[in-house]
């Protein structure tokens, strides 16, 4: 699948992706600051609520290094993930999304694309893949929160059929900000 000039692939997240996912999240100022343990728990098949975790990877060529503004707990810099067998994967993880499921609803808990990879349609491809996964899991409505000041994300979500469903006052901290609650009908 192509996103702009990039060759990308969306797939399920696995344990070997966690260091890179963690690094991407901590390189983005407004991304949720989960611990590695939280990302690992999202991969557990028996976790409640059940989660779907996806990553998007590309060819891995010509990437700008990630810049982390502060020292993240458990931070380990890695360039490429490996498979369970220890072989290098063909692509470099450049973004991820995690949704929690309580059918018939799901909540998109986080979607993060590395800064240097934004504006190439990668987030749109990842959101489309997540919507397909959620539909296959008997979800008929997806919800998400987005910072009220994040006009680029709001515009992208609206263009993909998401609708504003309300506001969550002072939902975000550092800096404190309202969240726009959005919903998407699936299926």
Description of each model-found segment:
Residues 107, 112, 121, 143-145, ...:
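Conserved beta-strand segments that form the floor/walls of ligand-binding pockets within enzyme
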Residues 120, 124, 139, 168-171, ...:
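Acyl-donor (CoA/ACP) binding surface of acyl/acetyltransferases
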Residues 1-16, 180:
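Conserved N-terminal entry element of GNAT/NAT acetyltransferase domains
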Residues 4-7, 50, 102, 107, ...:
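Exposed loop/turn and edge beta-strand positions of beta-sandwich/beta-sheet ligand-binding modules
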Residues 12-16, 20-116, 124-129, 133-137, ...:
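Acetyl-CoA-dependent GNAT
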Residues 114-128, 136-137, 147-155, 159-160, ...:
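Conserved glycine-rich acetyl-CoA-binding loop
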Residues 40, 149, 172:
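Positions that flank functional sites
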Residues 143-146, 158, 163-180:
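Conserved catalytic-core motifs of GNAT/GCN5-like acyltransferases
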């Amino acid at each position: 699948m192509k996103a702009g000039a990039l060759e990308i692939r969306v797939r399920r997240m696995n344990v070997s992706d966690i260091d890179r996912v963690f690094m991407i999240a901590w390189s983005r100022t407004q991304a949720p600051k989960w611990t590695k343990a939280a990302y690992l728990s999202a991969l557990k098949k028996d976790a409640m609520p059940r989660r779907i975790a996806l990553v998007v990877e590309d060819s891995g060529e010509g990437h700008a290094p990630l810049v982390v503004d502060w020292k993240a707990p458990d931070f380990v810099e890695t360039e490429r993930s490996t498979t369970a067998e220890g072989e290098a994967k063909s692509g470099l993880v450049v973004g991820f999304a995690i949704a929690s499921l309580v059918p018939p609803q799901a909540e998109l808990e986080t979607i993060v694309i590395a800064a240097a990879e934004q504006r190439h349609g990668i987030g749109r491809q990842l959101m489309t893949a997540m919507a397909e996964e959620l539909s296959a899991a008997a979800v008929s409505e997806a919800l998400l929160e987005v910072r009220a000041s994040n006009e680029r994300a709001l515009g992208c979500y609206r263009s993909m059929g998401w609708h504003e469903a309300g506001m969550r006052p002072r939902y975000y901290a550092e800096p404190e900000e309202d969240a726009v609650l959005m919903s998407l009908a699936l299926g």
